Structure formats: C-alpha cells, structure tokens
Amino acid sequence: MTVLEFKQDTPEIKRRSGRISPRNILYATDFSATSESALPHAAALCRRFGSTLHVVHVLSDTSLLLMTGGVDQVSFEVLYDDAQTLATGKLKRVSDGLGKIPNRSYVRHGKVWTNLSTIIAENDIDLIVIGTHGRTGFGKLLLGSVAEDILRHAPCPVLSVGPKVCGRTKLQEFVGTGSELSPVELELRHIVYATNLTAASQTVAPVAIALAKQFEARLTLIHVIENYSQLEIAPGPIESGVRQLQALVPKDAALAYVPEIVVECGPASDCIVNAAIKRDADLIVLGARPADGTTHLPFSTVHRVVAHATCPVLTVPA
C-alpha cells in the first residue's frame, strides 16, 4: 500500500559534477551458472568506467573434501592439483573473452572470504560483483555462507545479480563451459534507493544520488513502514518519513529529474521489489554495515530483495 508519493517529471534541474568511478572491480566465481550470470554486468561496469576486472576463484578445503569423499592426503593433493589446473584454464578463457578490458585472474586455496578479503585489500577493490540464486541461500558461490559473508563484511559496495535479473542469456566468455552469456550494457535510467531511515542513510544515500546525477537517471527514495496498525490514528511516522527522505537529497543536488519520495506500508522486501518493477528500475540501492555484521535493512529483507528483484541490487557499506 502506497501511503504518500511525490513525483515531478520535469527534467530541468541543472546538472553539476560529481562522479562515481570504480578503478578495480572484483568478480568472484565458482564457475556455476549462478555466478557466471554476473560476469556480463561486471564487464559492462569495466567498459563504462575503464576499470580493471579482478576475476577470482577459490578452491575451498570443504568443497575438495566433499569431492574426495574423505580419502587419503595423497588423493586430496592430486585432486587439488587437478582442480587448480582446471580452474586456471577456465579463468584463461574468461580473460581471453574480456577483450580489451584490463583484467587479472586469481586461483586461491582455503577459506573463501579470507582469500577474497586479502585480494580486496591488496588491490584497492572499489566494487564486488557476485551472482546469486533465490532458493535457500545466496547461490553456489560456495556452500551457503560465502555470499552472505561478502554482503555482511565487504568494505566496498557489492553488486548482486539475482535469478530474476533480465538478460541472463549467453556470453562468449563461457563458450565451452555450458553457460554462454550475452553482453549487457550499463544503462541506468531509474534508480530506487530503499532506506529504513537510520543514521546510515546519510552515508548511503549520496551513492544513489551520485549515480542518478552521473547517469542522468530518475531517482526514487522509498521508506517502508512494516508496523502500520496504528497509522490511521497517529499518522506521524508517515509525515516524518516523508520529511526524512526529502532531507536526504541536498538542495544543490542538481539532478536531471526531481527525486520521487515514496512512503509505503507492508512487508519491506515486497514493497521495495514492487516499487522497482513498477518503475522499470535498472538498479536498487540498499545500505549495509560491515563493521558489526548487521545490515541497514534486516539481512532477511536484503536477501529477499536480491532473490526477487528484476534488476541488480547494490549494497553499500555504511
């Protein structure tokens, strides 16, 4: 249920400088169709911003032990050598398919997040791109918790490409791997920024605003009230939500379009996803707090948004 919605379609606000331009993008893959679906988006970002793409595959002890069935150490070492050779070959094909995009490939062994965090720190990674599925977890990017670790602890923004994102077709990079996906182009025409209006909003909202400015995109700011049983008697939270959303956009933001302010009542994930679908949004922006492992929105909400969104979801540390 939409409680309040303010929108103006005139594109006459003056544009000013202010850009987001990641220099180093990390794309994590386990070579499943789930993770491979994010590669076209990582490549599109690199083409747009002139970024270097860091392609990472981690051979985890857990996955290798499952493959060996608990056999002796010699067999484990042979399997590891074979797995590393296979992974190196796949990464070489990915690299060759990236054409003129500057790229580096990594095969690591051990705990996934430990290896990723090291690569992130050593290479000043500005953005992480992952593919996810919508069942019980965040994809086969290793056995259950890896994508969650990334979203909770990444020191930089994370772009998640969920199972309902359009354009998950075939791409030349993966010819011969059974999952060829076609290129996509980075075109942001409408961005939806969802917030629960905590203090973190003041550090995350500028990212959505900067992207809207840079791409001359429409921007919708949405706040969802999940506990709305008393709103007819005391509508204060609605009015407060509108004022706080409006305050997130500086008066001198100089966007191409006047931002749309929306306050809705209902399940947060449903309202956010439906708002993005209604506007044919190209990106949803959410906040995350890596320091204490909690999300700006509840993690279950973030998960459901990623699982059901028809566009990529950008989570930003706050």
Which residues fall in each region the model found?
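Glycine-rich, Arg-bearing micro-motifs that act as flexible, cationic patches
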Residues: 127-153, 164-168, 283-308, 318
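Structural beta-alpha unit
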Residues: 1-21, 34, 41, 93-128, ...
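A short acidic, glycine-rich active-site loop
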Residues: 74-89, 232-240
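General small-molecule cofactor/ligand-binding pocket signal
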Residues: 54-56, 104-108, 159, 220-222, ...
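Small/aliphatic-rich secondary-structure junction motif
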Residues: 6, 10-74, 181-235, 308
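Short, hinge-like loop/turn segments at secondary-structure boundaries
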Residues: 70-74, 122, 147, 175-184, ...
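Extended, non-globular alpha-helical segments
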Residues: 2-17, 151-181, 236-237
